Amino acid sequence: MTKQPEDWLDDVPGDDIEDEDDEIIWVSKSEIKRDAEELKRLGAEIVDLGKNALDKIPLDADLRAAIELAQRIKMEGRRRQLQLIGKMLRQRDVEPIRQALDKLKNRHNQQVVLFHKLEQLRDRLIVEGDDAVEEVLSLWPNADRQQLRSLIRNAKKEKEGNKPPKSARQIFQYLRELAENEE
């Protein structure tokens, strides 16, 4: 029996591979299928959009052509076209597409949130007066200070006289116009 040197364990083939740098991420076949199915559903959502909504989503020319073709096709051909769109989406970064689609879906919710913020700002304008006017001017520099102050004065008079809040509504409309012009 021959005696092996002390460092014979260091010479094992394949031992020199660094495990930290070359970490392999194993993905199951079912996870790949779930991801593919989800991208196919995303493609179907995009196909169901109208032309105006489709223009707001960042799509390259090939994908746009495939989507427009799927909108014209019916029945079994449509299913195959949706699979093709899902395959095309797997080869692209879909995050900007998802964000644009979410923005389209949540437009109503965003408007409701904006209206609540504008209502709160209107109420602060009526209660605080000039301090809140400065905040409005910092948000929207093109706002008319004189018109805003006039509306606030009228709203305070209406509130004290228990009259309908006509000026308060006008303040809200003015703030909404400022917010819409900003977009």
From Swiss-Prot:
Coiled coil (UniProt feature): none
Keywords, sorted A to Z: Cytoplasm, Ribosome biogenesis, RNA-binding, rRNA-binding
Major localisation: cytoplasm
Stored SUPFAM superfamilies: PSPTO4464-like
UniProt-recorded Gene Ontology molecular function terms: ribosome binding; rRNA binding
Subcellular location(s) of the protein: Cytoplasm
Similarity comment: family membership: Belongs to the DarP family.
Functional summary from the UniProt entry: Member of a network of 50S ribosomal subunit biogenesis factors which assembles along the 30S-50S interface, preventing incorrect 23S rRNA structures from forming. Promotes peptidyl transferase center (PTC) maturation.
This protein's name: Dual-action ribosomal maturation protein DarP
Organism field: Citrobacter koseri (strain ATCC BAA-895 / CDC 4225-83 / SGSC4696)
Species classification: Bacteria, Pseudomonadati, Pseudomonadota, Gammaproteobacteria, Enterobacterales
Protein encoded by which gene: darP
